[in-house]
Regions:
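Long, acidic (Asp/Glu-rich), low-complexity accessory segments flanking structured domains
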Residues: 154-172
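Flexible, small-/acidic-enriched active-site or ligand-binding loops
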Residues: 127-156
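A short core secondary-structure module
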Residues: 79-133
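A structural signal for short hydrophobic beta-strand segments in well-ordered beta-sheet cores
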Residues: 70-74
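A short, Trp-centered hydrophobic/proline-enriched beta-strand micro-motif
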Residues: 47-56, 102
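Active-site-adjacent elements of ketosynthase-type condensing enzymes
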Residues: 59-69
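Short Ser/Thr-interspersed hydrophobic loop/turn segments at strand-loop and sheet-helix junctions
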Residues: 2-7, 102-104, 123-129, 153-157
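Alpha-helical interface subdomain recognition
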Residues: 1-10, 16-19, 32-37, 44, ...
Length: 330
């Protein structure tokens, strides 16, 4: 609801992305962090002293999270790790104090199961230390918030930055990914409702052939359809958020049920938002292409939840396998 309100206010994806990593990226830390880690980090994250970013995605692995190549090698002394590798599409890395990092601590060819061998860390992003470099990525939308490539070259971190058990990072990080999908769904809804509000206002104000264009069913019906899609997606999103929250204390809720709900919500909200944003541009006609009316910005930004943090096709694969019990296709 918070993320929906932010994007719907006109702040769009940039407004939401400025803070959303502080919410979802810290979920695994809050659940699996030690007492000392929580006392050091959580109060400063809550009061705004520290910002966080989520260091998972890599340029050569994409959705194959289990094939991540960034390594965390424990040094001979045992009191530190050396990080080497590259992350990409890391939002707010330019301003973040902390990164929730997923890195490989056991080579993939040595693990007994594919989900083993990755570890999660909560590390300082000390730009004055050797071994850390960042490069901004020029984006189509949401330009008020930075997205980055982050390079590690023997970047040293203390051993006590490890969150949870070594080699169990993939299981831990999943607790942040479901939260991320819920947040992206809320952000998509906000964009869709903001675009729809602009479209209906224009459809009421714009007069052609002696009457408002919204009086024509060719304008009214697509907007009504977009509204119903947003409302349905909102219900799915709120259901997913409630299920995610409940699962934290109710062990009877299957983990995959939460995943299905959160992924479905992200998919439905992203599609509903795209429909609303596209129709808002078309309702404005030629002026929809003008920056003055803002709807072109909403259309650019609504592509983000369609693409990230997981593609539409992979969500369909996931639901096909987990719900419909169909053979895995990838």
């Amino acid at each position: 609801m918070m993320m929906q309100t932010i994007t719907q206010s006109g702040a769009g994806m940039a407004g939401a992305q400025a803070i959303h990593a502080n919410v979802y990226a810290t979920q695994p830390l809050a659940k699996f962090g030690t007492k000392e880690q929580l006392e050091e980090t959580i109060p400063k994250i809550i009061n705004g002293t520290w910002r966080t970013c989520f260091g998972v995605t890599e340029p050569n692995t994409g959705l194959e999270t289990l094939k991540l190549k960034t390594t965390a090698t424990k040094n001979a002394s045992g009191d530190s790790y050396s990080i080497t590798g590259q992350k990409i599409w890391i939002t707010c890395a330019q301003v973040a104090s902390k990164m929730i990092l997923l890195a490989r601590t056991t080579p993939v060819e040595e693990v007994k199961r594919s989900t083993h061998g990755l570890s999660m860390f909560c590390i300082d992003l000390d730009r004055d230390k050797p071994g850390l470099d960042m490069r901004k990525i020029k984006k189509m939308g949401g330009r008020a918030v930075d997205a980055n490539e982050v390079f590690f070259d023997n970047y040293q971190i203390p051993a006590n930055t490890l969150v949870g058990e070594e080699n169990e990072g993939f299981r831990i990080i999943l607790h942040g990914m479901n939260a991320e999908r819920c947040l992206l769904a809320g952000e998509a809804l906000g964009l869709g409702y903001a675009a729809l509000e602009r479209a209906t206002q224009y459809a009421n104000d714009r007069v052609v052939f002696g009457r408002p264009i919204g009086q024509n069913q060719g304008i009214a019906h697509p907007l009504a359809d977009a509204y119903m899609k947003l409302e349905a997606a909102k219900l799915a999103t709120y259901h997913a958020a409630r299920l995610y929250d409940a699962s934290r204390t109710d062990s009877s809720i299957p983990f995959h049920s939460v995943g299905v709900a959160c992924n479905s919500a992200k998919y439905l909200a992203a599609e509903a938002a795209f429909t609303a944003c596209e129709r808002a541009v078309l309702t404005h006609g030629g002026m929809g292409y003008a920056m003055e009316y803002d709807v072109e910005r909403y259309l650019r930004e609504c592509l983000v939840p369609r693409i990230a943090p997981v593609s539409r096709e992979m969500i369909l694969n996931y639901v096909s396998e987990k719900v419909l019990q169909l053979p895995r296709s990838y």
